[in-house]
């Protein structure tokens, strides 16, 4: 087991509610780490509708999903949160009163006094492409997110998909990889036009390959890939060298391992009390779309409210001997100093 990373609060989910929780906790001198299965912050806002306008954030007539994410990231800068992206929490164990040990699928271990679940509708799970035997290579040669770019250096990399993730990683890994082959079922891409133009320029100059079709088979042994077969739309089959494969077929929402953490559930949601949005396990809170209570409305602004009340209760666990004096950012010089505005 790796050495534990110690923090006051561990937030599971780096969407808007998780990000704003950092702000509310930071005002109370509570440090936070955040874990998200996605390879970027913003949750559904950034992943599913980055350009979609949002009209119901108080005081902001219109903001896009990505715009809101960017503003929240700017707002929490003074508190220097640490992000662990492309990781999924697998286990939450109680080790003290208060105290929890949290383990991710990347083998990281955290020890904290409070856990905040801000995971939206659950964890995003990558869609597995329908390639026979692909499971044998997952985690060794087939990856659904890029954690360390360096592992792709001098490798023959096959990237499958036609959206922003596929094109972004095609362009980002191209300078490192021995050869990039992008595979998409049609010669029409959903990615940003500029990214598509860059990719086509690389193909035209012979610096990477584009194949229209689908990966139909994999070759290798002991979890190590050697080649991939690509079936074209004309039913022709081509075999290309493949050391690593990155399929980007989109994401589905699943409750995931939350069901194994000993927390009471109700219709795949986490019931909470409404004074601080604490779950059935003291010290574990749930805010945002993943929780449920009488009168619950799934709005971002409601999640912000839940985060503010959660932070007040979390302070009792982190600083049990310290009396909390409520202050306003408009008038408190100490809070303004924390925010860097005084």
Curated annotation (Swiss-Prot):
Query: Sorted alphabetically, which HAMAP family does this protein's record hold?
Result: FENR2
- Which protein family is named in the record? Belongs to the ferredoxin--NADP reductase type 2 family.
Q: Which domain of life is it from?
A: Bacteria
Q: Which cofactor does it need?
A: FAD
Keywords recorded for this protein, A-Z: FAD, Flavoprotein, NADP, Oxidoreductase
- What EC number(s) does the entry state? 1.18.1.2
How many cofactors are bound and how? Binds 1 FAD per subunit.
**Annotated catalysed reactions:** 2 reduced [2Fe-2S]-[ferredoxin] + NADP(+) + H(+) = 2 oxidized [2Fe-2S]-[ferredoxin] + NADPH
Q: Which N-terminal residues, if any, form the signal peptide?
A: none
- UniProt: FAD binding residues: 17, 36, 44, 49, 89, 124, 289, 330
Q: What is this protein called?
A: Ferredoxin--NADP reductase
Subunit structure comment from the entry: Homodimer.
> For this protein, what is any one GO molecular function term?
NADP binding
């Amino acid at each position: 087991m790796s050495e534990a990373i110690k923090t006051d609060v561990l937030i599971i989910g780096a969407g808007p509610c998780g990000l704003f929780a950092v702000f509310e906790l930071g005002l109370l001198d509570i440090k936070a780490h955040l874990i998200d299965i996605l390879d970027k912050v913003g949750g559904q806002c950034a992943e599913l509708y980055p350009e979609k306008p949002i009209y119901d954030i108080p005081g902001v007539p219109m903001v896009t999903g990505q715009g809101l994410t960017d503003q929240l990231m700017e707002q929490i800068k003074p508190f220097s949160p640490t992000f662990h992206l492309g990781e999924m929490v697998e286990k939450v164990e109680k080790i003290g009163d208060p105290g929890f040990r949290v383990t991710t699928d990347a083998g990281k271990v955290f020890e904290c006094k409070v856990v905040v679940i801000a995971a939206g509708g659950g964890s995003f799970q990558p869609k597995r492409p329908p390639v026979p035997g692909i499971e044998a290579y997952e985690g060794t040669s087939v990856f659904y997110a890029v954690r360390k770019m360096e592992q792709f250096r001098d490798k023959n990399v096959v990237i499958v998909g036609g959206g922003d993730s596929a094109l972004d990683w095609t362009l980002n890994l191209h300078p490192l990889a021995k050869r990039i082959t992008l595979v998409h079922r049609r010669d029409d891409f959903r990615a940003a036009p500029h990214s598509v133009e860059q990719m086509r320029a690389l193909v035209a100059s012979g610096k990477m390959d584009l194949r229209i079709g689908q990966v139909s088979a994999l070759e290798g042994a002991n979890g190590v890939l050697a080649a991939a077969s690509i079936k074209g739309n004309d039913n022709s089959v081509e075999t290309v060298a493949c050391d690593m494969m990155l399929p980007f077929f989109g994401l589905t929402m699943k409750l995931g391992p939350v069901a194994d953490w000993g927390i009471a559930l109700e219709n795949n949601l986490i019931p909470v009390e409404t004074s601080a949005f604490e779950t059935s396990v003291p010290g574990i809170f749930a805010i945002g779309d993943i929780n449920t209570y009488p009168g619950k409305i799934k709005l971002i602004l409601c999640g912000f409210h839940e985060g503010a009340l959660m932070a007040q209760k979390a302070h009792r666990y982190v600083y049990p001997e310290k009396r909390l004096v409520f202050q306003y950012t408009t008038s408190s010089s100490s809070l303004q100093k924390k925010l860097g505005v005084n």
